[in-house]
């Protein structure tokens, strides 16, 4: 199982939100580059970065910080947030980003998604963020009438190989992932699933591993030290 330490960027800082609400932010580190280096030194093999400002604006607003992170670490970096054009994808890949996560664009611009998958194949990941089972977009501010299962099936049919699934109600809560929705999603599609939101303990990670979930994104639990990164990396290697 892949472990993805999370760095959420807002105004150039590393922050955490509570249930996706921008008004409920906590600054975890004023220096995201330093945080990325910390994660790498602890053994992280890949980083998950979200440009929160970009998710709202519809364009990458933290590109200089993302570029600095890519130059500062030797491990791969995947990035999401506000990526809604091929130019944006190409720009991120050109500064050293390994994989790009498309969210809003996956729902509203299928032709862009298809072209991105055609050009960049496994480098394109789709992020499905759900609230009460329905897909949320534009930085989680808008709720659609599309179910997360329906969108996942569409993505699979378009050649997407990996999905990041986030239950917004769990994000930043340390209340545990939504295992039920993840299990249903796993039954519905045959592509890689990365779980995000609510992971609070090594037991949560073990349960996801037992479900054969491909990867898990861990944010608040690492910053609040309810999960030790070195320990969880060791545990997942032994499983």
From Swiss-Prot:
Family note: Belongs to the HisA/HisF family.
User: Which GO annotations describe the biological process of this protein?
Assistant: L-histidine biosynthetic process; L-tryptophan biosynthetic process
Which reaction equations make up its catalytic activity? 1-(5-phospho-beta-D-ribosyl)-5-[(5-phospho-beta-D-ribosylamino)methylideneamino]imidazole-4-carboxamide = 5-[(5-phospho-1-deoxy-D-ribulos-1-ylimino)methylamino]-1-(5-phospho-beta-D-ribosyl)imidazole-4-carboxamide
Locate the active site: 8 (proton acceptor), 129 (proton donor)
Q: What is this protein called?
A: 1-(5-phosphoribosyl)-5-[(5-phosphoribosylamino)methylideneamino] imidazole-4-carboxamide isomerase
Q: What Pfam families does the entry give?
A: His_biosynth
UniProt KW keywords: Amino-acid biosynthesis, Cytoplasm, Histidine biosynthesis, Isomerase
- Return the broad EC class: isomerase
**Subcellular location(s) per record:** Cytoplasm
Q: Which GO terms describe its cellular component?
A: cytoplasm
Pathway annotation from the record: Amino-acid biosynthesis; L-histidine biosynthesis; L-histidine from 5-phospho-alpha-D-ribose 1-diphosphate: step 4/9
Q: Which coarse location class describes where this protein primarily resides?
A: cytoplasm
Query: What EC number(s) does the entry state?
Result: 5.3.1.16
Q: What is the organism of origin for this protein?
A: Bacillus cereus (strain B4264)
Query: Which InterPro entries does its entry note?
Result: Aldolase_TIM, His_biosynth, HisA_bact_arch, Isoase_HisA-like, Isoase_HisA-like_bact, RibuloseP-bd_barrel
Q: Which GO terms describe its molecular function?
A: 1-(5-phosphoribosyl)-5-[(5-phosphoribosylamino)methylideneamino]imidazole-4-carboxamide isomerase activity
């Amino acid at each position: 199982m892949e472990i993805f330490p999370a760095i959420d960027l807002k105004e150039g800082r590393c922050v955490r939100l509570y249930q996706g609400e921008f008004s409920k932010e906590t600054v975890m580190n004023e220096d995201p580059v330093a945080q990325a280096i910390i994660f790498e030194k602890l053994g992280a093999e890949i980083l998950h970065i979200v440009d929160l400002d970009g998710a709202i604006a519809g364009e990458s607003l933290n590109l200089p910080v993302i570029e600095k992170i890519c130059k500062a670490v030797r491990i791969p970096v995947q990035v999401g947030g506000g990526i809604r054009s091929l130019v944006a994808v190409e720009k991120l890949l050109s500064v050293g980003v390994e994989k790009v996560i498309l969210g809003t664009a996956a729902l509203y611009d299928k032709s862009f998604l298809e072209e991105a998958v055609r050009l960049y194949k496994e480098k394109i990941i789709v992020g499905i963020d759900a609230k009460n089972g329905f897909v949320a977009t534009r930085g989680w501010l808008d709720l659609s009438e599309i179910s997360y299962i329906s969108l996942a099936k569409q993505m699979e049919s378009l050649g997407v190989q990996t999905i990041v699934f986030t239950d917004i109600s769990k994000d930043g809560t340390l209340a545990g992932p939504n295992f039920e929705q993840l299990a249903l999603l796993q039954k519905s599609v045959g592509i890689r699933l990365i779980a995000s939101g609510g992971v609070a303990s090594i037991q949560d990670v073990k349960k996801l591993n037992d479900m054969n979930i491909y990867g898990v994104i861990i944010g608040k639990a690492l910053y609040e030290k309810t999960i030790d990164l070195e320990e969880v990396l060791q545990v997942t290697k032994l499983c």
